[in-house]
Amino acid sequence: MFDLKNLVIASGNKGKLREIGTLLAPLKIAVVPQSDFNITEIDEPHPTFIENALIKARHASRQTGLPALADDSGICVNTLKGAPGVFSARYAGEPKSDQRNNMKLVEALKTATDRSAYYYCVAVLLRHAEDPQPIIAEGLWHGEFILEPRGDGGFGYDPHFL
């Protein structure tokens, strides 16, 4: 076992930071965004969510000396052969923009008869930067991409994922 009083979160996504902080608050774990250490987001060069989450967690843990939690996630649309997938955050290019990403996906699916999709998320927890046994959790949620946004409590593709 390891002492988990402080946990660096390898993300600059304010929505994710807020959700993780809320989830871990009852456990009395201090969630520290990597930006508090002046760590910039690392590139996500890999073709899989697991590899990208692992490289982000290792980078944050190396820079801070703290245990690290990182995720990589995205929406995968069946008609688009899994796109945007690992490119979900930058689907419409740089700089990252939820609004532009959603607009691009709406345009791509405007005439599609099948808008089935799934949201995939991988979370990696490292006890230290060289942890040989990272804790890896995966989640998958099936749904449909809708052209008109709904709701107001989410971020990313949430308004279009039903």
Residue ranges with predicted function:
Residues 2-8, 14-162:
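Anionic-ligand binding patches
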